[in-house]
Amino acid sequence: MSDRGNVRIALKVDVDTHDGLARGVPAIAELLARCGVSASFFIACGPDRMGRRIARLLDPRFGAKLLRTRAVAVYGWRTLLSGTLLPSRPVATAFPDALRRLAAAGHEVAVHGYDHARWQDRLPRLSEAQVRAEVTRATTVLRGILGTDPRGFAAPGWRCTPASLAAVDAAGFAYRSDTRGSYPYLPAAAGQVFRAPEIPTTLPTLDEVYGRAARRPAELADYYVGLLRPDALNVHTIHAELEGGPYVGVLDTLLARLRRRACFVRLCDEAASLATTRLPICAVREGRVPGRAMPVALQGQESPARE
């Protein structure tokens, strides 16, 4: 990144757990307020059952990531056992006032699925009716808290299928942020082009690069600044449990580097501008990204323009 002010960046804050909303979101919101920055917060709207993911320790890639990012320090045993040895706890409905405060402060509050662990681990095995129910329940919860229809949907774990793409369209969302990619597009899968535009995450997440690209906050900030593209919308997904927890210093340092050089946008505002844009059609495919244990949905090959 070179010239000051020529870079657009959207901060996408994924809130996966009860403690992420209870502790991580206030810490991130405080930092954003101090910097005068607005962000898009995507909230898991159902139960926190992250403990059910503990079975993935059998996957050496998952176990290595947990060790590299100090998962016990990040999440705590209460979250790591939630929904297994310990009862699950609600996420969105446990802190409705916190979500209203985010909206009142000018942040976008949007949907990050209902049962995050179920979606991330089982989505390909869910029926179309089950997928629709996940989307509908999440939307109903957030609408009940905010009194307005959420405009955006972000798939937990960047997992999506033709059934989930169709369910998001059917629910009336203005846009989605389900995949990893390079630029906004209309997603296509199973011979169908879907209505709601996709605004993909373009930058790697902290848990993917920590201990691989760098460790110190200043080094990580430099790493991210070096990845920014002045000719595109840069979407950086952060997690309430990480950047709002033990790694809050990384976010603080990054914001300090960016606040005078970048224009921050909310994803909902970007989606509104896309409404008048002829977007390319790109296939959605499954693949892997460095540093992440599970496969994710990726922006695939661009299709010929429609007449």
What are these regions (language model features)?
Residues P204, E241-E243:
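Short, glycine-/Ser/Thr-/acidic-enriched flexible segments
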